[in-house]
Amino acid sequence: MVYSYSEKKRIRKDFGKRPQVLDIPYLLSIQLDSFKKFTDQDPTGERGLEAAFRSVFPIKSFSGNSELQYVSYKLGEPVFDVKECQIRGVTYSAPLRVKLRMVLYDREAAAGTVKDIKEQEVYMGDIPLMTDNGTFVINGTERVIVSQLHRSPGVFFDHDRGKTHSSGKVLYNARIIPYRGSWLDFEFDPKDALFVRIDRRRKLPATIILRALEYSTQEILDLFFERVEFKIKKDTLVMTLVPERLRGETASYDIKDAEGTVLVEAGRRVTARHIRQLEKTNTTELEVPVEYIVGKYAAQDYIDPDTGEVLVSANSEISLEDLAKLSLAGIKELSTLYINELDHGAYISDTLRIDPTTNRLEALVEIYRMMRPGEPPTKDAAEALFQNLFFSEERYDLSKVGRMKFNRRLSIPDDEGSGVLSKEDIVAVMKNIIHIRNGFDEVDDIDHLGNRRIRSVGEMAENQFRVGLVRVERAVRERLSLGDLNELMPQDLINAKPISAAVKEFFGSSQLSQFMDQNNPLSEVTHKRRISALGPGGLTRERAGFEVRDVHPTHYGRLCPIETPEGPNIGLINSLASFARTNSYGFLETPYRKVVDGVITDDVEYLSAIEEGRYVIAQANIEVDSEGRMVEEQIACRHKGESTFMRASDIQYMDVSPQQIISVAASLIPFLEHDDANRALMGANMQRQAVPTLKSEKPLVGTGIERTLAVDSGVVVAAKRGGVIDYVDASRIVVKVNEDELRPGEAGIDIYNLTKYTRSNQNTCINQRPCCSVGEPVVRGDVLADGPSTDLGDLALGQNMRIAFMPWNGYNFEDSILISERVAQEDRFTTIHIQELSCIARDTKLGSEEITADIPNVGESALSKLDESGIVYIGAEVKGGDILVGKVTPKGETQLTPEEKLLRAIFGEKASDVKDSSLRVPNSVKGTIIDVQVFTRDGVEKDKRAIEIEEMHIAQARKDLGEEFKILEEGVLSRARNLLLSAGFTEAQIAALPRKDVLVQVIDDETKQTELEQLAEQHEELKADFDKKFEIKRRKITQGDDLAPGVLKIVKVYLAVKRTIQPGDKMAGRHGNKGVISKINPIEDMPYDEQGNPVDIVLNPLGVPSRMNIGQVLEVHLGAAAKGIGNKIAAMLEDQREKGLAEVRNYIKQVYELGDEVQQRVDIDSFTDDELLRLANNLKGGIPVATPAFDGAKEKEIKQMLELAGLPTSGQLKLFDGRTGNEFERPVTVGYMYMLKLNHLVDDKMHARSTGSYSLVTQQPLGGKAQFGGQRFGEMEVWALEAYGAAYTLQEMLTVKSDDVNGRTQMYKNIVDGNHQMQPGMPESFNVLLKEIRSLGINIELDQE
């Protein structure tokens, strides 16, 4: 493998045995691709905004004299960029402008004669835009739209599993689900009649819908039944024989062949042998006794040819009298319905008998009454209602997916067709459900991923947009009919408000639009790849059963079987598997390698769950020889959702990678294959809660996916093009682009601005740090700067800690964690949290609030950190209760005493009519002010601080753009100098030229002169461009802010809090091994090894066996080896000054070559000495290793690594007690584990109440930290005190400490006076109880005696 310059800085040793056929696809593509389809112009009009417009336009007036047509749309440029939107708290969106054409037709002339056409661009609201990282900025906060897994449109056949009826009979049902429109259900009742429901309303006999579709009784019977033909003879009947129909029947008469030989005697059962005999003798007719016809049903109406009277009506039961009538009327032939109990049930026939309707109109009226009970039906209304239900394109749409699923399920050859239902469609569904009831077909598996599809952002946004457009459509149609159209323009017809409101509602408050989980890069990526079954049009938590939540065979390679939340949402919220993607229909697909004649090829094909069922698919870990042939005879594989063994020649596909079944978060867990699934689930979920530490550290034991994840998440800065690093500082990196990657006429400089100390959604700190230096070559995709939780471009969620598995004085009882003081001293788990506190000055009825340093009754010391505008300085260290922004609010006029009036008159207006409402630091917080933003309403005078901030921003913008300009100008000038050199100028001449004169020299060579002129032109353009950019920036910075009504000014203060690790914080490993820190132990008390090195963390060994997450033990061993190798390299580097690099080179080579059949090849010999030194220096802290899930390091390889590191292969060391110096009685497992600090910090949870607010009704203290509430003293706690007989304590708890209003006030006074006594009174909740009993009409009074 070829490594780039920056990749050579640190190479992770990979233990993977399988070749990487397919790289993990871009992780955010599910979001970005979907939204791109929504916003991009689609000439076919099948998706996105284009489809929404085409589905609603043209809008015709009621009279048909005018219409509004859609021509095209375009999205404008957003006003603010993403960062500005976040600071200002506005939505990152672009204006949507639509070109509409209004066509007026001439009433007098022939139809379709155009009188007038007006075209105009109309503004139709703002469309929120997706950022490059797949998020939306809505009102200044980053949000993610989670994809939804919903039931695909189409037709589904199911049964109730015998739960509906007490008899336990299985009742079948069919359901046609459109993309939009009414649901149509068919269902059997316990008596085997077929019923229909529309939109889950009252059920009707299913034949009503057939009558409404203009089928007569006769046609209905012909659709669903075969006929049995009889010829009427004098005393007997002759039946046309279809031998197969006799199977299983008991003969009620002798069955004879054509020669009269008795084949089956009366009373005997007809078997397959008898049928074969009948077929052999070619018997086509059978004589049956007259009684045989009794109980059969007529297949058609029989009419007396003379009188026209109906002798026997279709579907009526035939008796001997009916037969006699037919015989008399001279009818010689009779058809009956072929029905048998076994596989040709009389379902439709029975249904027709309970059908109250006889013709189409009655059926339509019946449907109308069911849909609109209480309304009087008219013929037109009934027809229109039925027509609109399933046959109108405006009201009903199966969608492309729905039509495809519908046709495939009913074996209709074409995948495409109309979006509405046809008569044939409904009949086909009814035929199929009868087919299933007859036992010829199976019901569908509703949890199969072929029946559930993904609805992503773009599609949901399009649906919401269409909802908005439909609302507008009604208004437009009315205006077209009412207004004077000659005066109106398209703009006057369209009101963009409903569209904006629909889109805003979706992005702002839909259940699937979620506040982005921004704890760390992994949590961002996972959130964007989340697939939820909840949300509008999906399931609800309460109604979702076990089957929906369970892992299904079709989840393989599509949804992760591990990563799902614990709790009520388990199984309803899933994560996309690493390689999965959605196809054009929205179904999940996963890639497989094609296998041809037992040879595995590198061709990769994506298969959906439906297609996968048809093939035989082997797993990725089968043994293969050098030519790609499978070694074993019998191969473990999957076929039709079952796991089985098959011959190698039968295999058609093979998995792409062993990691393809799990999600990104699960594939970050090393040795996942050795962990119990429940613990792996916790491990995957807890990695998302890891807080970025102050100094990120890459995991020693990783899985090799860390880099992909860090780059795809967008938190690191990756090079867009190759080149050389030209300039680096803390906030900017400049790359001089390679000549061959330049676009013509370009300056050849890429500038990357870094994000510094910004607040994330979870109040953690986002900060980017450069990880390259000037002069380094870079290639496209190289990491230039690390973000939060990344280290040299690798995801780094925690820290590598030296761990010992042993009990230690009970401090690691029940998963507690004992850590060394050194961990806290070295700031290993110190995190920075940034809080945003806002102070809003409003216009009140009594006057406007004012932000000022002049606050009544506040001493000088409290104002020491404020400037003259009353706003805190940047860099001030503040603690709980300090004033951050001084603000005064006008008070209502109070009655003044004569004395006060006199004083007022003498000393003028005093500030007694305002009260202090300043922004203060919350109680438990202590930190440093890192930024202040002031937003002022347009037209309100800016204070001094706001102007200062503005000037600072302008100066910063000028500096940024100036430097950018300088760099770009230098690029142009250097190319001009090179040109002059090639034209014969000497270096001295060029050096002597002033900068501005370089571009105005005269060269003899014409082509070079032209080139120089082009460069001069480019320089002028750059200058103009710089001025324009600066002007735009300046205007943006100085313009007033669009604040909410009544708000004059907002001051936002950003406070950085540094949190070191302390007892009570929650920590975890990556294998679901979580615990709370119980004690921070002095270094000298920690157990230490023979070299005197103490351990960092002591974990309880009992946490491993019962939890079955053995992966952590293997990680500790491999981590010890990796660290040991690093120590050896460090020692060799110390010696290399004398011995040279040969020893280091050989040792590193040995390490990378270790392992059987390992795919990774690192050619250490090709490294220059400098590259090798840099690599060795980066490996000093330990060599990072990758052990991919299901393809990781074997026990043998871990032992070889331990040997190479010079450590015992048992992985255990002798340890000594730090307190006594005595050796522990047996060796202890010691090694390195990657530990995470989770975002469950004791500082955010600890809380104590003195006095505070009370509930209005019960007068009891509120609960919870946010309300500064108390602790609940519940009934069990009361029982405990009762059991101890602690009467006074109990009385105190239930009265003065809770809801005895007078008692608690009195007690407060007593304590202040130093009189420690209490007088308990009546608890308020007792009065509430009395009131509640009285509300039931029972008078209850308290006898005070």
UniProtKB/Swiss-Prot annotation:
Pfam families for the chain: RNA_pol_Rpb2_1, RNA_pol_Rpb2_2, RNA_pol_Rpb2_3, RNA_pol_Rpb2_45, RNA_pol_Rpb2_6, RNA_pol_Rpb2_7
Entry keywords, A to Z: DNA-directed RNA polymerase, Nucleotidyltransferase, Transcription, Transferase
Cellular component aspect of the GO annotation: DNA-directed RNA polymerase complex
GO biological process terms, semicolon-separated: DNA-templated transcription
Source domain of life: Bacteria
Disulfide bonds: none
Enzyme Commission designation: 2.7.7.6
Gene3D superfamilies found in the cross-reference section: 2.40.50.100, 2.40.50.150, 3.90.1100.10, DNA-directed RNA polymerase, beta subunit, external 1 domain, DNA-directed RNA polymerase, subunit 2, domain 6, RNA polymerase alpha subunit dimerisation domain, RNA polymerase Rpb2, domain 2
Catalytic activity: RNA(n) + a ribonucleoside 5'-triphosphate = RNA(n+1) + diphosphate
Entry GO MF terms: DNA binding; DNA-directed RNA polymerase activity; ribonucleoside binding
EC primary class: transferase
Free-text function comment from the UniProt entry: DNA-dependent RNA polymerase catalyzes the transcription of DNA into RNA using the four ribonucleoside triphosphates as substrates.
Record NCBIfam families: PRK00405.1, rpoB
Family (UniProt): Belongs to the RNA polymerase beta chain family.
UniProt subunit comment: The RNAP catalytic core consists of 2 alpha, 1 beta, 1 beta' and 1 omega subunit. When a sigma factor is associated with the core the holoenzyme is formed, which can initiate transcription.
Record protein name field: DNA-directed RNA polymerase subunit beta
Annotated organism of origin: Shewanella sp. (strain ANA-3)
